[in-house]
């Protein structure tokens, strides 16, 4: 790897450790020419995942899009950013464990709803209303009744 300061091609690793989530390795390097230090990250290369949308079009999986949708559902609710990130992690873990290269939005929505229901029922109903495309108040009432029956 070339030094970002002098572009020399050789360096030594001074320190190496896993990142907090264990998904990559952080390395402190020292250039053998200019002796300046810099940080690099080593991460497993993954195959891009395609999401099959309801209209059968495909787009690349976008974690940020999923997190933003969750944040809207959880707005002004007692759900932390960390909990939202954990749900997103669970979706990614599920896709990765099943070694899927394509996944439909139904599967993603089911995983999100299963996890969101455990955290906050109001956020769950909000998310479900968009995901399942509730058409009227009766659909909301039906979902709320199902939640209450299970409790």
From Swiss-Prot:
Negatively regulates transcription of bacterial ribonucleotide reductase nrd genes and operons by binding to NrdR-boxes. This is Transcriptional repressor NrdR. Keywords: ATP-binding, DNA-binding, Metal-binding, Nucleotide-binding, Repressor, Transcription, Transcription regulation, Zinc, Zinc-finger. Belongs to the NrdR family. Its cofactor is Zn(2+). It comes from Clostridium botulinum (strain 657 / Type Ba4). Binds 1 zinc ion. GO terms for molecular function: ATP binding; DNA binding; zinc ion binding. It comes from the Bacteria. The keyword Metal-binding applies. Residues 49-139 form the ATP-cone domain. PANTHER family: TRANSCRIPTIONAL REPRESSOR NRDR (PTHR30455:SF2). Pfam families: ATP-cone, Zn_ribbon_NrdR. A zinc finger (unnamed) spans 3-34. The keyword DNA-binding applies. InterPro entries: ATP-cone_dom, NrdR-like_N, RNR_NrdR-like. GO terms for biological process: negative regulation of DNA-templated transcription.
């Amino acid at each position: 790897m070339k030094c970002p300061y002098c572009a020399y091609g050789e360096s030594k690793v001074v320190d190496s450790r896993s990142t907090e989530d264990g998904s990559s390795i952080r390395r402190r390097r020292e250039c053998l020419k200019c002796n300046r230090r810099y940080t690099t990250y080593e991460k497993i290369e993954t195959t891009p995942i395609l999401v099959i949308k309801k209209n059968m079009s495909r787009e690349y999986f976008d974690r940020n899009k999923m997190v933003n949708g969750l944040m809207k559902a959880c707005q002004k609710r007692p759900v932390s950013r960390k909990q939202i990130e954990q749900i997103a992690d669970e979706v990614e873990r599920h896709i990765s464990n099943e070694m899927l290269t394509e996944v439909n939005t139904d599967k993603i929505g089911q995983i999100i709803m299963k996890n969101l229901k455990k955290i906050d029922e109001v956020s769950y109903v909000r998310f479900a209303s968009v995901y399942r495309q509730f058409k009227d108040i009766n659909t909301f009432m039906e979902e709320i009744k199902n939640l209450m029956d299970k409790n």
